[in-house]
Amino acid sequence: MGKQPVKLKAVVYALSPFQQKIMTGLWKDLPEKIHHKVSENWISATLLVTPVVGTYWYAQYFKEQEKLEHRF
């Protein structure tokens, strides 16, 4: 008394070559979406960017000081 396999119908999704509005939802209200993301995550972005910029600035400063040290 085993189970009998059931045939499932395949679902095929296709886009019409004549359809022009394929990804309109992606671009709809884009400035509002960007503003929302920035206003929600500005603390996280600051905490990510600050150490990276600080490290880069320190490396450039150290390199410049090392170059100037050999002048005298």
From Swiss-Prot:
Cell location: Mitochondrion inner membrane
Cellular component aspect of the GO annotation: cytosol; mitochondrial inner membrane; mitochondrion; respiratory chain complex III
Residue ranges annotated as Mitochondrial matrix topological domain: 1-41
Listed Pfam families: Cyt_b-c1_8
Record bears the keyword Electron transport: yes
Principal location listed in the UniProt entry: mitochondrion
Keyword Membrane on entry: yes
Topology in membrane: Single-pass membrane protein
Stretches of the chain found on the membrane's Mitochondrial intermembrane side: 59-72
Domain of life assignment: Eukaryota
One GO-annotated biological process of the protein: mitochondrial electron transport, ubiquinol to cytochrome c
Assigned keywords, A-Z: Electron transport, Membrane, Mitochondrion, Mitochondrion inner membrane, Respiratory chain, Transmembrane, Transmembrane helix, Transport, Ubiquinone
Record-linked SUPFAM superfamilies: Ubiquinone-binding protein QP-C of cytochrome bc1 complex (Ubiquinol-cytochrome c reductase)
Transmembrane segments: 42-58
InterPro entries named in the record: Cyt_b-c1_8-plants, Cyt_bc1_su8_sf
Summary of the function given for this chain in its UniProt record: Component of the ubiquinol-cytochrome c oxidoreductase, a multisubunit transmembrane complex that is part of the mitochondrial electron transport chain which drives oxidative phosphorylation.
Family to which this protein belongs: Belongs to the UQCRQ/QCR8 family.
Subunit note: Component of the ubiquinol-cytochrome c oxidoreductase (cytochrome b-c1 complex, complex III, CIII), a multisubunit enzyme composed of 10 subunits. The complex is composed of 3 respiratory subunits cytochrome b (MT-CYB), cytochrome c1 (CYC1-1 or CYC1-2) and Rieske protein (UCR1-1 or UCR1-2), 2 core protein subunits MPPalpha1 (or MPPalpha2) and MPPB, and 5 low-molecular weight protein subunits QCR7-1 (or QCR7-2), UCRQ-1 (or UCRQ-2), QCR9, UCRY and probably QCR6-1 (or QCR6-2).
Record protein name field: Cytochrome b-c1 complex subunit 8-1, mitochondrial
Species whose genome carries this gene: Arabidopsis thaliana (Mouse-ear cress)
